[in-house]
């Protein structure tokens, strides 16, 4: 514990304060306030964090001793005040609980009831956050035997007041000779850590990690020390060095990592004004500034700070794995004779774990640094790597240099890993965890721990990349065929599966450099393929996949797939069926690996539609594009066949169709045309809007719920409709707006429910939606376009300036308005309100929500049903949209663009 520090607590001054005041509470509160202010100022000035948290514990010791002395405990009383838990270690953060054990010799507490109650009341009154228990030595033993948490807490204890002999007796009766022997304790703690990690999704890379409990957090270091304490009686990192479980460099790294996390935790408590161990978005930017990080042209300060955080916890996880593996080998010796199985002259299995046959294996044959992972892929029965071999891997990483990277033995081994029938993802993760992957591929090393500060990318770039490869592997499993039927079928027939894994490894490799990461990554991928002696065609395919890995997703979500020109342009880009197959599978894996919430039935159906329409175009030949007139004729003929079979008069149908333009038949299937036509012809002419709802199979690919609205056109139709859908908690994915020559509108919306699924066949929900929409369209003044709802906490921290781009599609005679803005409740309704103010008509819309941002595309015309041709009008429209979408944003707006 620290030496006496009068600036923090002056006992003489405190006694004088007590003497001057009628109540002791004010003096105690003043002393607490004083040491808190001094310690916070010292933290802000960069003082050593270990000293700060030890000083805080010392200050609380002084307060507790002064409080304890105010009560009559009797002469030679067998009662002691004992610090336990983190406070017992002598470590205390600004708002951490002060965990206390009032320890008695016997279970008879009655004689001490009055002073105990008075003491605890005083602590409450002076504002100390105390967690307390009152137990006898025997009660401690009974509760510790039954509860892992209790025994763990009692292992870390020190006496604050009273005889230390009570604590010594308590430690004796709760020692490993009486309960929780080291083997049992180790197994329980290992299981506890596994459960805790599962709570945080078994990743160090959560967007808002818990610095204490997440994988790689402070608790992982404490778990190691608790295990060591139970086995060896030692409770510090240097003791692990003496016992041979750590080397000095690892001990130093763990100590510095612990101190970094202590600084983060101290800052969190200080900023939050309470006990807060979650590194929430609310605090990440502030802590980044506090730690001296600044934005630059390539990365935000918060991204650089979080990369430091993720690299620290990754290193802690690596050493936690190493030490626990080592503990397992020592604490859980195999009761059976050791089983040795040679693999080759360099490696063998010892009881199922791979190890080197000699300590100099990596030094003598550096290629073994890669070979070990290939062997584990070839032998999936291998349980893992022995602790000594993990340490040798770590210590031999320096052998990987440029000469190593260009050695054909090493390049061949690395490619062989990608050709393995199983274990690719698992062993790439091991390579990353042991620091081999980033050393072998320096470009991969740059993205380790790199977070993109948004809600769309929920993993660091390296974790996302390895997750993508994991998803590619999952597509090979038979059980995945139901969820990913097309991708599972395609991946089985890829001529060289290793190429898609290489493309996956490199698709985001250039993130964080500035510039177009797809272009830069394609260059890196080409260089990798060349240095690994891949054939020219393979090299070009991998590079092309990296360069275009976003194109299929962007096309599917932002363009009108009913437009034959869109399909033709995309088919020209891919060129052949092989490129299409590889790109489709890569896109499916990329979306799933970016954020699990992104993959829904709608996105799946859009990609499937784009794939199949492109496949048809390629089979037909790029020199034979789809003829629009022929497509319209085919749709009408098929629809008419259905209608006639249903008893609808052909003349009535054709009369209705004559009022519709070509776009209607290009943008709807024959089945939908027949469905709409029959319902319209049977709908009473009483002015009530017609609202139809069904599960959609648009072009046999889309999956969602289709809402079809037929009603007399009105000025505010789109604005009112989207506002009503917002209030009904519907997420609009697509909108197709058709206005007939008789001034009726035929609008089709593809929607998902709030949970991301289609509405389904729930009669009550369908009735609610139908009635809500009819009411809104009959009473439009009751539906304001500004939806007032609370903005979710996480969205508040990702505000950015809305961007509005307007261009002209001369072929379709519409203006294309693209909006990129922070997601907010009622955003689409706000946009609809602006369109209403400017007397604009929406012909089509593509809606995409990506994490905290929306990327929506609207095809609009003016009051004369023409594209927007007036630059001044466009500027005013942009300004109005930016102003409306910037509300509650808190950021300056960025310039927008007009491209005619």
Curated annotation (Swiss-Prot):
Residue ranges of the region described as Uridylyltransferase: 1-342
Q: Which residues form the ACT domain?
A: 706-789, 816-891
Q: What is catalyzed by this enzyme?
A: [protein-PII]-L-tyrosine + UTP = [protein-PII]-uridylyl-L-tyrosine + diphosphate; [protein-PII]-uridylyl-L-tyrosine + H2O = [protein-PII]-L-tyrosine + UMP + H(+)
InterPro entries (alphabetical): ACT-like_dom_sf, ACT_dom, HD/PDEase_dom, HD_domain, NT_sf, PII_UdlTrfase/GS_AdlTrfase, Polymerase_NTP_transf_dom, UTase/UR
List every stretch annotated Uridylyl-removing: 343-705
Top-level taxonomic group = Bacteria
Its GO biological process annotations read: regulation of nitrogen utilization
Q: Which CDD domains match?
A: ACT_ACR-UUR-like_2, ACT_UUR-like_1, HDc, NT_GlnE_GlnD_like
* CC cofactor: Mg(2+)
Give the family per the record.
Belongs to the GlnD family.
Please state what the annotation says regarding this protein's domains.
Has four distinct domains: an N-terminal nucleotidyltransferase (NT) domain responsible for UTase activity, a central HD domain that encodes UR activity, and two C-terminal ACT domains that seem to have a role in glutamine sensing.
Q: Please identify the protein, giving its name as recorded.
A: Bifunctional uridylyltransferase/uridylyl-removing enzyme
Organism in which the protein naturally occurs: Pseudomonas aeruginosa (strain ATCC 15692 / DSM 22644 / CIP 104116 / JCM 14847 / LMG 12228 / 1C / PRS 101 / PAO1)
